[in-house]
């Protein structure tokens, strides 16, 4: 009896997670209503932290920009024009990773040919958790890779030991994008 209950609960959780994955959308237009709170941002970043990382190095870092003045400054000075509109009415999360840790030995020797690629990979895993948790809490996101990293570093006092990767806009959606077409799974997988 208990085994059956646990089995059904596990299946329900998995179904809810699958639905979350399938229903999440990239949001490029945000409502001025319902700004995200500091507590909600902390909840989202805690979820990001749960992602696996190389030797549990946990090198992802997050710089949350919530004041309207700072969002406007970052948008105008650090994002290309095409991304500035995507930041309107949103808060911003600048994502970085501490370089020369993930994929490296303690003495600084790379573990393999990817080197700092592992830090970026690990941050991608964290950012996936971040956008899924945001969606679960009712917030949309868009990950923007086009940004001026040096200017972000200057404005937000990001240390030179970190690599600036992306700016994530986060807020209440003002649009409902259709589900984009996905390739057939048979087209992207090979079995041997």
Stretches found by the model and what they are:
Residues 2-14:
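Short, Lys/Arg-enriched N-terminal segments with co-localized hydrophobic residues
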Residues 19-27, 32-35, 166-192:
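C-terminal helix-cap and adjacent tail motif
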Residues 25, 69, 147-150:
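Alpha-helix/helix-capping structural signal
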Residues 41-46:
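Short amphipathic alpha-helical segments
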Residues 48-49, 94, 100, 111-155:
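Small-aliphatic-rich amphipathic alpha-helix that forms the alpha element of a beta-alpha
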Residues 84-93, 157-179:
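A glycine-rich helix N-cap at a beta->alpha junction
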């Amino acid at each position: 009896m208990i085994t059956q209950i646990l089995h059904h609960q596990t299946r329900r959780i998995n179904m809810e997670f699958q639905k979350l994955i399938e229903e999440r959308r990239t949001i490029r237009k945000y409502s001025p209503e319902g700004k995200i709170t500091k507590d909600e941002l902390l909840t989202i970043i805690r979820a990001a932290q749960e992602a696996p990382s190389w030797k549990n190095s946990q090198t992802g870092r997050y710089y949350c920009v919530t004041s309207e003045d700072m969002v406007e400054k970052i948008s105008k000075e650090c994002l290309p024009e095409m991304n500035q509109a995507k930041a309107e009415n949103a808060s911003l999360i600048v994502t970085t990773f501490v370089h020369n840790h993930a994929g490296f030995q303690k003495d600084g020797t790379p573990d393999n040919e990817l080197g700092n690629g592992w830090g970026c990979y690990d941050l991608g895993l964290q950012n996936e958790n971040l956008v899924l948790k945001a969606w679960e809490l009712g917030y949309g996101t868009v990950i923007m890779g086009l940004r001026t990293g040096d200017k972000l570093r200057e404005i937000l006092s990001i240390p030179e030991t970190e690599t600036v990767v992306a700016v994530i806009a986060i807020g209440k959606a003002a649009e409902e994008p259709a589900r984009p077409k996905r390739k057939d799974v048979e087209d992207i997988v090979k079995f041997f």
